[in-house]
C-alpha cells in the first residue's frame, strides 16, 4: 500500500459514487478504489459484483474512466502500449479509451464478448500486455484474476442488451444502417434466447432511454443492479401465495350461482365481507333454502355480519336449526366466549342462565306488548334453545308484534342480555348501575333512583337490591358515593329505551 501514501495529499474519486473523498475515507482492498460509504451501503460481500457491473456499464456506454492526467513517471514505451493497435492507426480520443472501431479487429477470444447490439467490447479481463489500468487517481493497479467465481457467467456473456444513448451509434464507429439491421436481427434472437438472469428487458430499455440519460451516474449504476433483485423478489414471493390461494379457492368454485361477485385474485388474499357471504350462503349448508330466507335471518347469528346495520326481523324468521346455533356459538371470538362465561358464572349454570333469560324476557315482552298474546311458535322454540344453552337475544324476540332493532353491536352476539334485577327491563349496555360485589346485580336508573330515595340520600345508601353486598375480600358492605347518588338522582338524565320511537 505504499502507492496510497503518494496520493494521500489529494482527494480520491470513488469508483462507484464518483465523488471526491479524503484518503482516509477510501478503501483500497478491492479491484477499484471505493469509499467507505459505498462499501457499507452495498456490503463487503457484494461490492466486487457492483464494481464489475459498474465497469461493464462504463465501458458499454462509453464513459470516460480517467479524468485525471496520466500517471506520473511512466515511460513513453508503456504509454504507447496502451494504444496497442497497428502503426498506422490514429490515437484514440478521450471517449475512445477502449477503441470500438475497425482499428482493432474484433476477436472472439476470452477477452471480448458480443453485446446484444452487436458491438464487441472488452469483458473486463485485462490483457497480459496491457499496463496496469489506472482509474481516476487510483494508486493501485487493477489486480489480475480478482473477479469472484460468481461473476464469471456475468462477464462471459450474460450481460443485458446495451442500447446506444440518444442514438449515438455513429460515435461507436458503426454505420447506422448496419446497426439497425444488426439490432433487428438480434431482436428476434433475444425473444428465444432471453435468459431469466438478464438484468433488464429490451422493452424497458427503449421506454426509459430518456429517463436513463437524465439521471446521475451513480443512480444509473444502482438502478441497473436493483432491477434484477426487485423483479425476482416480487415474482418469487408472489408465486407461492398465488398457487396456494388459487388451489384453495378451487373448492369455492363448485356452484356459486348468483352469489358469486367475481372476487379478484390477490397475491396476498385479504378477508372481505363478500367472500364470507359466499361461504355462508353457499350450497354447503343445506338448511338455508333460499337467499330470501337468509335475508330474514338475524345478523347476530352470522359471525361475519356481527356488526351489520340494524334490520327488521319478522316474528317467524328464525330458520337456524339447534345444531347450527350451537356451531355458531362455538365459532365466536374468544372475547365473546369469555364475556358469556363471566355472565354465566354470576348467574349460576348456563342452563339456569338460559331459563332466567327466558323468564325475564317473557315478563318484559308482556309489559311491552300491552298484553298482546304470544305467537304459538315462540313456545315451541324455547325448549330447543334451552337444551342447547344458546342465549336468547331480545332483538330476535319472536313474540314482538312490532319490529325491534338489533341491540348495540358492542354487545357480543349470543351473550346474556342485560336486564334489570328488580323490574327485569332491558338495560342499555352503558347506562345502568352495576353492583361491584355481585355480577348479577344490575339495575336501571329508575329502580336505582327509587332505591336511593327509599334508603335516604343523606345516609349510607347500599345496593338497590336491598342487600348489603360486601366488598370483595372484606365484610364491609359497599355504599354509593355522593357523586354517584347525585348523578343517579339527576332528573334530566333520561335513558332511551328500545320501545321509545
Swiss-Prot record:
Q: Which domain of life is it from?
A: Eukaryota
Bias (Basic residues): 256-266
Please provide the Gene Ontology terms (biological process) for this protein.
negative regulation of macrophage differentiation; regulation of transcription by RNA polymerase II
Q: Which InterPro entries match?
A: I2BP1/2_C3HC4-RING_sf, Interferon_reg_fac2-bd1_2_Znf
Please provide an example of a Pfam family that matches this protein in its UniProt record: IRF-2BP1_2
Q: Where in the cell is it found?
A: Nucleus
- Region Disordered, as annotated, extends over 60-155, 240-277, 306-330, 344-410
Q: Which GO terms describe its cellular component?
A: nucleus
For this UniProt record, the keywords arranged alphabetically read as follows:
Metal-binding, Nucleus, Repressor, Transcription, Transcription regulation, Zinc, Zinc-finger
Q: Which Gene3D superfamilies match?
A: Interferon regulatory factor 2-binding protein
Leader sequence range is none
Region named Cys-rich: 420-467
According to the UniProt entry, which residue ranges have a biased composition of type Polar residues? 311-320, 356-378
Where would I find the RING-type zinc fingers in this protein? 420-467
Q: Tell me the GO molecular function terms.
A: DNA-binding transcription repressor activity, RNA polymerase II-specific; RNA polymerase II cis-regulatory region sequence-specific DNA binding; transcription corepressor activity; zinc ion binding
Enumerate the PANTHER family for this protein: INTERFERON REGULATORY FACTOR 2-BINDING PROTEIN 2 (PTHR10816:SF18), MYELIN TRANSCRIPTION FACTOR 1-RELATED (PTHR10816)
Q: Which family does it belong to?
A: Belongs to the IRF2BP family.
Query: What function does this protein fulfil?
Result: Acts as a transcriptional repressor.
**Which protein is depicted?**
Interferon regulatory factor 2-binding protein 2-B
Q: Which organism is it from?
A: Danio rerio (Zebrafish)
Amino acid at each position: 500500500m505504499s502507492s496510497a501514501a503518494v496520493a494521500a495529499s489529494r482527494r480520491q474519486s470513488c469508483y462507484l459514487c464518483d465523488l471526491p473523498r479524503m484518503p482516509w475515507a477510501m478503501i483500497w482492498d478491492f479491484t477499484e478504489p471505493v469509499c467507505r460509504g459505498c462499501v457499507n451501503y452495498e456490503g463487503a460481500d457484494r461490492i466486487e459484483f457492483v464494481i464489475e457491473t459498474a465497469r461493464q456499464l462504463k465501458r458499454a456506454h462509453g464513459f470516460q474512466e480517467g479524468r485525471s492526467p496520466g500517471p506520473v513517471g511512466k515511460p513513453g514505451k508503456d504509454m504507447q502500449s496502451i494504444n496497442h493497435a497497428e502503426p498506422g492507426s490514429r490515437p484514440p480520443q478521450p471517449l475512445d479509451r477502449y477503441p470500438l472501431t475497425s482499428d482493432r479487429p474484433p476477436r472472439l477470444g476470452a477477452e471480448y464478448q458480443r453485446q446484444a447490439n452487436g458491438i464487441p467490447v472488452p469483458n473486463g479481463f485485462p490483457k497480459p500486455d496491457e499496463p496496469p489500468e489506472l482509474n481516476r487517481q487510483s494508486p493501485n493497479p487493477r489486480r489480475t484474476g480478482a473477479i469472484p467465481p460468481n461473476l464469471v457467467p456475468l462477464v462471459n456473456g450474460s450481460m443485458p442488451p446495451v442500447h446506444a444513448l440518444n442514438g449515438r451509434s455513429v460515435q461507436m464507429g458503426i454505420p447506422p444502417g448496419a446497426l439497425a439491421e444488426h439490432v433487428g436481427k438480434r431482436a428476434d434472437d433475444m425473444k428465444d434466447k432471453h435468459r431469466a438472469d438478464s438484468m433488464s428487458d429490451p422493452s424497458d430499455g427503449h421506454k426509459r432511454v430518456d429517463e436513463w440519460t437524465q439521471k446521475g451516474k451513480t443512480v444509473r449504476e444502482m438502478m441497473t443492479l436493483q432491477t434484477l433483485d426487485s423483479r425476482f423478489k416480487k415474482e418469487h414471493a408472489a408465486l407461492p401465495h398465488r398457487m396456494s390461494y388459487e388451489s384453495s379457492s378451487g373448492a369455492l368454485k363448485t356452484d356459486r350461482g348468483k352469489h358469486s361477485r367475481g372476487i379478484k385474485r390477490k397475491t396476498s388474499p385479504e378477508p372481505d365481507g363478500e367472500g364470507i357471504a359466499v361461504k355462508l350462503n353457499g350450497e354447503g349448508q343445506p338448511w338455508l333454502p333460499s337467499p330470501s330466507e337468509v335475508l330474514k335471518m338475524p345478523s347476530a347469528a352470522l359471525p361475519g355480519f356481527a356488526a351489520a346495520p340494524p334490520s327488521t326481523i319478522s316474528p317467524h324468521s328464525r330458520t337456524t336449526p339447534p345444531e347450527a346455533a350451537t356451531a355458531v356459538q362455538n365459532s365466536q371470538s374468544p372475547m365473546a366466549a369469555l364475556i358469556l362465561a363471566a355472565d354465566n358464572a354470576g348467574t349460576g349454570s348456563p342452563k339456569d342462565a338460559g331459563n332466567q333469560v327466558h323468564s325475564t324476557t317473557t315478563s318484559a315482552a308482556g309489559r311491552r306488548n300491552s298484553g298482546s298474546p304470544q305467537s304459538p311458535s315462540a313456545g315451541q322454540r324455547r325448549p330447543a334453545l334451552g337444551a342447547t344453552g344458546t342465549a336468547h337475544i331480545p332483538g330476535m324476540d319472536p313474540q314482538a308484534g312490532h319490529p325491534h332493532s338489533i341491540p348495540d353491536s358492542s354487545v357480543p352476539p349470543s351473550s346474556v342480555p342485560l336486564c334489570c334485577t328488580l323490574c327485569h327491563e332491558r338495560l342499555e349496555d352503558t347506562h345502568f348501575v352495576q353492583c361491584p360485589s355481585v355480577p348479577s346485580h344490575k339495575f336501571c336508573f329508575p329502580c336505582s333512583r327509587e332505591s336511593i330515595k327509599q334508603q335516604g340520600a343523606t345516609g349510607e345508601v347500599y345496593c338497590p337490591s336491598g342487600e348489603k353486598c360486601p366488598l370483595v375480600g372484606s365484610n364491609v358492605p359497599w355504599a354509593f358515593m355522593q357523586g354517584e347518588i347525585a348523578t343517579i338522582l339527576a332528573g334530566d338524565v333520561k335513558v332511551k329505551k328500545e320501545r321509545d320511537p
